[in-house]
Amino acid sequence: MFRLAYNTNGLSHHRILDALTLLSDLGYEGVAIAPDVACLDPFHPREGEVESVRKLAADLDLELAVETGARFLLDPRRKHRPTLLEESAADRARRADFLRRSIDLASDLGAGVVSMWSGASPNGVKADAADSEEDDDPRERERIWDRLCAEMPPLLHHARERGVRLAFEPEPGMFVERPAGFDELARRLGDQGDALGLCLDVGHLLVTGDVPVGDVIHRSASRLVHVHLDDIAGGVHEHRMFGEGDLDLSEVLEALVEIDYKGLAAVELSRDAHRGAQAAEEAMSHLRRALRA
């Protein structure tokens, strides 16, 4: 059975140890930790912080994962930049360095999974968007693919050495935004891609039109190692509380049970951080009702 978890980007106004205790008290069995400027910043580690988090998580029997979606950690002016797809090799190296540090952090915390995404390409080219085939320059798309495929093997090697699984998340608006793009990345990486897991955000599937969500979960079963839970309304990429959008939460959880998924299913509600404790409690209530349905 999978474990219900919560992403700390939805508790960004809480101290990390307080967040772990709160989530455990609410019944969560895991925490997806998003390193950021005020939470386990891998560029400015605080003495004893990692060990304190690891010990408390163990005491509370919380399974941990590490998420790498911090908005402005690498650049205070540009959200989610630089990426692995930048024109500048130095910029690509900055993202790769952050990902390596996040892998190290996960290993030190005892977390088994690190999630990542491709980032947006500099000129907006998409690998897998249904409406991009006629508009994008195929040669430019191949150049972006070449960059991504060149950056992935060293990261996969580092993760393997540290005993951590990399989970790649298709993200709307980024170069790889659909499960089909993940499949293509794994194909292009060949044998090196065998270790790459899939991080599936069920809300994103409503944005990109990859539905029914339950069917996508079943098709992805063999590569699925991490799951994000959130609702989406009208196909707009804004994470919402369950019940505020179009997601059939019972369908999602039933599909995860049917495929015998064993990883974390982590609620991701970063836009609700201003009411983080209340949102985490509400989300758990929705999850419990859906599991009983």
Task: List the model feature ranges, each with a label.
Residues 1-5, 10-27, 54, 58, ...:
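Histidine-acidic metal/acid-base catalytic patches
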Residues 17-18, 59, 73-197:
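Active-site acidic/histidine proton-transfer and metal-coordination neighborhood
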Residues 26-37, 66-79:
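Short, conserved active-site loops that position catalytic residues or coordinate cofactors/metal ions
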Residues 33-34, 65-69, 116-117, 221-232:
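Non-cysteine beta-strand/loop elements that form the S-adenosyl-L-methionine
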Residues 34-53, 118, 124, 237:
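Glycine-rich, proline-tolerant flexible connector loops at the mouths of alpha/beta enzymes
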Residues 41-63, 132-134, 138, 164:
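Short acidic, glycine/proline-enriched helix-loop-strand junctions
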Residues 42, 46-49, 88-95, 137-144, ...:
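Residue-level preference for long, well-ordered alpha-helices that form the structural scaffold
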